[in-house]
């Protein structure tokens, strides 16, 4: 009786070095989000389905791979025009902030993004310190400057510690909505846009109230409700 020929395995597509590197970063992102940063490169290579020497050809150390994950997951989204959106004074500040936080939360409100961020904080890695600096300099400082401009205050001096703390309270409240929903799986207001809108009303009114003593006499207050 004639034996059936075993089916041929489909040939695996040979990846270019750049595509292979991207694949490693994508799989490492999944690995770090599920397992944290405690494992060694041997476990990581096994999870990626490659040998340790091959992984080392692309990333000489685990720290190098972590830095690349940080760059692709946390820094690349800032190249999408967010900074221009925040500083476009042809539009009311409230509209700009609403649009920004809707776009921003579409990126960070994923289980993967949040887990990596929280794991890195527990492990004491630099990712959190780097990202906190990015948020402070590229987001919160700009928001404070735009709030000052809207209120008729000087915009060229650095944000004060009090201004930054108020901005952090506002920003962190939105961030923690994502933690409650995607990490704790707790009930939240499902209308995310409404949550952002409510937070903006409180922040803009609070900024006006806390720092309004510095306003020029007769200046119209910022509009909280759009």
What are these regions (language model features)?
Residues 1-19, 85, 211-226:
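N-terminal intrinsically disordered/low-complexity leader segments
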Residues 20, 62, 69, 73-74, ...:
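Hydrophobic/aromatic residues within well-ordered alpha-helical segments
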Residues 23, 27, 31-68:
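Helix-turn-helix
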Residues 26, 94-109, 114-119, 164, ...:
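Amphipathic alpha-helical segments that line or abut small-molecule/effector binding pockets
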Residues 69-99:
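Amphipathic alpha-helical linker/stalk segments
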Residues 83, 88-89, 95, 106-144, ...:
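Short secondary-structure transition hinges
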Residues 126-153, 165-168, 197, 201:
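Amphipathic alpha-helical packing segments from all-alpha helical-bundle domains
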Residues 140, 156-183, 191-206:
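Hydrophobic alpha-helical segments that form the core
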């Amino acid at each position: 009786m004639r034996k059936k020929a075993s089916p041929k395995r489909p040939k695996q597509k040979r990846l270019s070095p750049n595509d292979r590197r991207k694949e490693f970063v994508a799989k490492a992102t999944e690995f770090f989000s599920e397992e944290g940063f405690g494992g060694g490169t041997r476990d990581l290579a096994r999870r990626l389905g490659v040998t340790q020497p091959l992984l080392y050809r692309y990333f000489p150390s685990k720290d190098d791979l972590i830095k690349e994950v940080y760059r692709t997951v946390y820094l690349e989204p800032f190249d999408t025009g967010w900074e221009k959106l925040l500083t476009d004074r042809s539009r009311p500040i409230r509209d700009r902030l609403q649009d920004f936080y809707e776009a921003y939360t579409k990126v960070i409100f994923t289980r993967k993004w949040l887990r990596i961020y929280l794991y890195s904080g527990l492990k004491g890695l630099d990712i959190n310190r780097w990202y906190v600096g990015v948020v402070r300099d590229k987001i919160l400082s700009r928001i404070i400057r735009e709030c000052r401009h809207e209120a008729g205050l000087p915009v060229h001096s650095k944000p004060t510690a009090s201004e930054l703390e108020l901005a952090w309270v506002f920003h962190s409240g939105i961030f923690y909505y994502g933690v409650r929903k995607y990490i704790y799986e707790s009930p939240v207001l499902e209308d995310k846009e409404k949550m952002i809108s409510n937070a903006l009303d409180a922040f803009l009114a609070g900024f006006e109230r806390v720092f309004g003593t510095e306003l020029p006499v007769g200046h119209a207050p910022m509009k909280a409700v759009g």
